Amino acid sequence: MEQEICVVSFSGGQDSTTLAVWAKKRFKKVYLVGFDYAQKHSVELECAQKIASLLQLPYEIISLDFLENITRSALFKNSNDLMGHSHVQNKDLPNSFVPNRNAIFITLLHSYAQKIGASNIALGVSQADFSGYPDCKEDFIKSIEHALNLGSNTAIKILTPLMFLNKAQEFQMAKDLGVLDLVIKETHTCYQGERKILHAYGYGCNECPACQLRKKGYEEFQTKVLFQ
């Protein structure tokens, strides 16, 4: 029975919403878990709650607001750093990177999975079309899966069906799953928390790295649709 339970890391964004629908079609029980880490775009939590209700899936938020007190990122509410620059702690990374964020998320998801008897965790990470975050790469995910299972004497699988999909392919996946309209109108990606203007690709400021990546992906998706 436990093989039929999946815990989905759920932010209310394009990736995690597509992932949630994917999981719902494959597992008997799906639990959505989100994180409040004092992010500027906390409106995503409101979007996540609405989407969870529309999908009729249980949703729980874990508070991690202490993160902004122990590390630095342009994503935090207390940050005055402008997006699009290098991280002050590591010039090779964008300043929107939150050090060890995914490691913390995955560790907590792993504990949650043990609590409810789930043998699967699903993440919406991708290394094909991403923002330069090393903790979204396959080698990191495989390594932390191995470490957490060693430390807990478990065999919980971390599933990453979007790992090698770019944004255009993710839009196609959403279309194939029958939720393209939901992804465009209800999900949130914008780092600035902007939800006043609905663009063709969804709501956003149209300027931050997240919006630019999503816009580019949608335009590529539309181009492929036209030539199909």
From Swiss-Prot:
Its recorded name reads 7-cyano-7-deazaguanine synthase
Short name of one Pfam family: QueC
Cofactor comment: Binds 1 zinc ion per subunit.
**Superkingdom of the organism of origin:** Bacteria
Q: What does this protein do?
A: Catalyzes the ATP-dependent conversion of 7-carboxy-7-deazaguanine (CDG) to 7-cyano-7-deazaguanine (preQ(0)).
* Reaction catalysis annotation: 7-carboxy-7-deazaguanine + NH4(+) + ATP = 7-cyano-7-deazaguanine + ADP + phosphate + H2O + H(+)
Q: Which pathway features in its UniProt record?
A: Purine metabolism; 7-cyano-7-deazaguanine biosynthesis
